[in-house]
Amino acid sequence: MRVVFWGTPDFAVESLKALIESKHQVVAVVTQPDKPKGRGKKVQPPPVKVLAEKYSIPVFQPEKVKGNKELYQKLKELEPDIFVVVAYGKILPEEIINLPKYKTVNVHASLLPEYRGAAPIHRAIMEGKEKTGVCIMEIVKELDAGDIYQCVEIPITDQDDIVSLHDKLAKEGAKLLLDTLDKIEKGEIKKVPQDHERATYAKPIEKEEGRIDWKRSAREIFNQVRALKVWPKAFSNFRDTQIKILECEIIDERSEGEPGEIVKIMKDEGFVVQTGKGKLLIKKVQFPNSKPISAADAVRGYRIKEGEKLF
């Protein structure tokens, strides 16, 4: 099939790569405009654009899609069979969705109708889910509400964080996408409507969600740290500065001391903090304007002592 691919970040790269290597023909890629990134605010292309250009695939980067007649005309001239959308970053208007022969499908990183919206992977980890998944659905006007072609389930383990789960879902999504496209082309697949009454929404992550409330349970804080490891990172006040908690481990349920209190120093592993329920062994941290370091190095370098508090 002649495919136009819509996607922007790393999550979309796996699906584009799979399509390029498949029997389908990627006739164009639509992605977000290049944006300034990092401390130096250097303008950088989206990861999807980098891959597309490597394979000499035409790339469109419209500032806006709705009402963009020039883009619509260019896409129409490509005579696409289907549009594939993976984390493009903007909602597509109906005239675009309905342009191709087989309309438009989307790779979404949740078990729909759970976690429609922008941050399904983060929310699944933060809310302590034991499983998530990826679905291929038809795009409709309403956000993530289209009929579902196929889904695959993936367990969430305590070893997972936002990075590992993101990568697993991106890979599984790419495989499922190819399988779905083959079945659509052969007419071997039926769409199933979502149960809209069961729909939940994964709103975008806000910076302040990184702030740790030590009165919460060890399990809740552990999930927060894993989910927000890339951005904004879980953080807490310590002494007269802010410290980011990058890795931790639940060690036991007994209580000693106040929430936020450092109750034990484990020289080669880090330091133990009491929470509202249970304790956390802090294993990796980051101080302002510094690189991430092991909590054991932080104990030595910053002379962290029992009885000090994170707040």
From Swiss-Prot:
Family matches, as InterPro entries: Fmt, Formyl_trans_C, Formyl_trans_C_sf, Formyl_transf_N, Formyl_transf_N_sf, Formyl_transferase-like_C_sf, Met-tRNA-FMT_C, Met-tRNA-FMT_N
UniProt keyword annotations, A-Z: Protein biosynthesis, Transferase
This enzyme's EC code(s): 2.1.2.9
Reactions that this protein is recorded to catalyse: L-methionyl-tRNA(fMet) + (6R)-10-formyltetrahydrofolate = N-formyl-L-methionyl-tRNA(fMet) + (6S)-5,6,7,8-tetrahydrofolate + H(+)
Naturally occurring in which organism (per UniProt): Persephonella marina (strain DSM 14350 / EX-H1)
GO molecular function: methionyl-tRNA formyltransferase activity
Function of the protein: Attaches a formyl group to the free amino group of methionyl-tRNA(fMet). The formyl group appears to play a dual role in the initiator identity of N-formylmethionyl-tRNA by promoting its recognition by IF2 and preventing the misappropriation of this tRNA by the elongation apparatus.
Protein name listed in UniProt: Methionyl-tRNA formyltransferase
Keyword Transferase: yes
